[in-house]
Structures are given as C-alpha cells and as structure tokens.
Amino acid sequence: MKRRWSLITAIAVLTVALAFVVVQLVRGQGAGDQPAAAKPVASAPGTDPGALRGVAWWPLHQSGTAKAGERDAEALGRTQWVDGPTGGALQLDGLSGYAETGTRLDTKGQDYSVAARVRLTADDMNGFHTALSQDGDQISAFFLQYSGQDQNFAFSFSGARTVAEKTEKPQAGRWYHLTGTYSQKDHRMQLYVDGRLAGSRIATSSVDPTGEVVLGRAKFNGETVDFWQGDIADVHLYDRELTPREVESLSAREPD
C-alpha cells in the first residue's frame, strides 16, 4: 500500500512539473512579442521639434533658403553673410540692408508668434532697430525690436509697446533670442528674451497687415525706418501663440 501511494505521489509531482514546463514554453514563445500597441501619446508642447518649425523658418545660414514655408528670403541693400550662433547669420548695416520674405501673417484675426536670434553692434544703442516687422499701408503691424528710448528689447504695435523689464539691458556684440507672441482672445502681447518672459501687456493693433513680413527694418508714416544694425539668424513665424515651454525649447535649440 505504501508503495502504491508513493507511486501516485510521484505521478502527481511529475504532472505538476510538466504543466509548469508547458506554461513556461508558451510564455517563452511570446517573449519577443510586443504588447498590444496603445495609442501614441502626443508630445507635450515644447518637446516636439517639428511643431517648432512654424509656418516659415529662415535659418539665414549663408543663404535665404527657407527650411519651412514656401518662400525664400531675399536680402536687399547692404548685407553680407557672417558666422552666427547656430551656423550663420545675415549682417545688416543699419542704413539700407534688410530682407523680404514674401510671407504674411494674419495679425488681425489669428494668434501669432515671431522669433529670431539677434545681435546688435555698438555703433548706435540710442535709436530704434527692428529685427522683424510686417508692413501695413503706412505703419508696421508689429515690431520685434530694440528700443533706444527704453534701452532694451521690445515687442510693439502702433501706440503700444511691451518692453523687456525683467532682463538686463542688452549688450552690443552678444547674441540674444527674442520671441514675441500675441493672443487675439486675451489681447495679450508678450515678449520673451532668451526663453524667459520679459514683458507682457494688454493691447490691440488697428493696423491691417497689407504687406509681407520683413527682416531688418520697419515702416512708419509710409517710410522705411529703424533698420537693424547687426546680425539676424533663425527667423521663425507661427500662426499661433507659442506656450512658455515652447519658447524656452526654441531658445535652447533649433528644431531639426
């Protein structure tokens, strides 16, 4: 009887062991398989390099070729190509040099943002120098500029100016990253310097954007004014208001 029970016990143990081996083999066959794919999670704002290209992007690395958008920038007046912070830049003389983009933003009906890397020379830190603007009939729809009156960077409309109040005064010969954003819903214009919010105010512009975005000058009373004296690189245009995180990301690194 004892032998019989010993035999039954041995068979039971072998059965359990065999079942365990079979389970492990089944699992092993699927070890290299991936689990059922979940829906991809969208990148958080500021982490998707493609989204930061914008509707237009001109690196200005020895040419006006666009990396986003359909139109290249055309340099006019006294300009030359120089080294820049990320590969090259367009140098403007402060008298006649600027660049046309052939591109428009809907600054009256849509949120928008503009950004550029800029460097001023030491020749004139008391005047107005505009890095980016968009022509209206008589005056620019916006100005991303240096204000000699305030001795600092500014994002401006006709009759309204957001000055960089949270940063030190700009130094000639140093590169800065400037971003101007506008929300139609909140009527909020904001200026960022090197990825950080530097100024904000509530304002509206009555100027219709009848012309193109221009690099290196502005328009006032029907005349071209405020020519940039220094260098400009990596110009971006957006048909939306960038988030603070996106601005910080763009300032730190250009998209691929």
Predicted regions span which residues?
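Extracytoplasmic low-complexity segments
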Residues: 2-96, 185, 199, 248-256
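Extracellular glycan-recognition modules
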Residues: 51-55, 62-72, 83, 95-153, ...
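A general beta-strand register signal
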Residues: 91, 156-158, 192
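Short, aromatic/His-centered strand-loop micro-motif at the edge of beta-sheets
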Residues: 102, 153-177, 222
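Surface-exposed loops/turns
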Residues: 108-109, 171-172, 209
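Short tryptophan-centered beta-strand motifs in secreted/extracellular beta-sheet-rich domains
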Residues: 173-182, 191
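Flexible glycan-contacting loops in extracellular carbohydrate-active proteins
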Residues: 201-231
